[in-house]
Amino acid sequence: MPLELVTVPCLSDNYAFLVHDAGTGETSVVDVPEAGPVLKALEERGWHLSQILLTHHHSDHVAGVEELRAATGARVAGAAADAHRLPPLDLELAEGDLVRVGASEGRVIEVPGHTVGHIAFHFPDSSLAFTGDSLMAMGCGRLFEGTAEAMWQSLRKLSALPPETMICSGHEYAASNARFAATLEPDSPMLIFRVGSIAAARKEGRPTVPSHLSDEIATNPFLRAGEASLKAAVGMVDAEDAEVFAEIRRRKDKF
């Protein structure tokens, strides 16, 4: 049975994600920008939290961990490489490790770039991937610690997941990301359609997260740095893929 997903808005533009196994009653949360909205979502559904999964150490993803742990007794799991700057971990994780939510098994994927210790969680039976600030709707995270090459390789890992995977990223950034993408390829029919869809969703107050990986592969410029059409659009026809990615990231940082 697939996990039930609840997207919980936090702060001004963050998301936490509750995942619930109806068969066992077990519930986990991925990232905790603040505890209040997560506790409210749990109470509304009568769910008990047993596990907190963390993608990376930034405060807008972990600030609510201690309050939530104190209120629920949930254990906390995060990257072993970042244990020294995450809230105290009950379980340290690395590439290929498995986490469980009830009967569902998720795999840890190391995705350095935004931070050097960033990880993602892929639950194949539910077609869910929790990517934090690595792969995002129409974008990717800024390179605060890692290199462009590292982030490009991380994005390639994520783009190799099944295309039906739902990408649960950590922020509501799609509208800005889409406007930027349109500056690179203003005449792309697929991009025009997606920009319009995102704008309509936000006008109606609907989240753009999660997004389909197939849509990201088709329209997210940060996943398409190896495509000839995008290389031509940025004037880097003969450049290496990671160099094109770095240029797109540089332009987005100034957008």
Curated annotation (Swiss-Prot):
Keyword Phosphoprotein in annotation: no
Residues reported in the UniProt entry to bind Zn(2+) 1: 56, 58, 114, 133
GO biological process per UniProt: methylglyoxal catabolic process to D-lactate via S-lactoyl-glutathione
Known EC number: 3.1.2.6
Family affiliation: Belongs to the metallo-beta-lactamase superfamily. Glyoxalase II family.
Pathway annotation from the record: Secondary metabolite metabolism; methylglyoxal degradation; (R)-lactate from methylglyoxal: step 2/2
Residues annotated as binding Zn(2+) 2: 60-61, 133, 171
Swiss-Prot/TrEMBL cofactor(s): Zn(2+)
Keyword Lipid metabolism attributed: no
Function: Thiolesterase that catalyzes the hydrolysis of S-D-lactoyl-glutathione to form glutathione and D-lactic acid.
Any one GO molecular function term: metal ion binding
Sections of the chain in a coiled coil: none
Disulfide links within the chain: none
Cofactor: binding comment: Binds 2 Zn(2+) ions per subunit.
Name this protein carries in UniProt: Hydroxyacylglutathione hydrolase
Spans traversing the lipid bilayer: none
InterPro entries registered for this protein in UniProt: Clx_II_MBL, Glyoxalase_II_hydrolase, HAGH_C, Hydroxyacylglutathione_Hdrlase, Metallo-B-lactamas, RibonucZ/Hydroxyglut_hydro
Native source organism of the sequence: Cereibacter sphaeroides (strain ATCC 17029 / ATH 2.4.9)
Swiss-Prot/TrEMBL catalytic activity: an S-(2-hydroxyacyl)glutathione + H2O = a 2-hydroxy carboxylate + glutathione + H(+)
Keyword field: Hydrolase, Metal-binding, Zinc
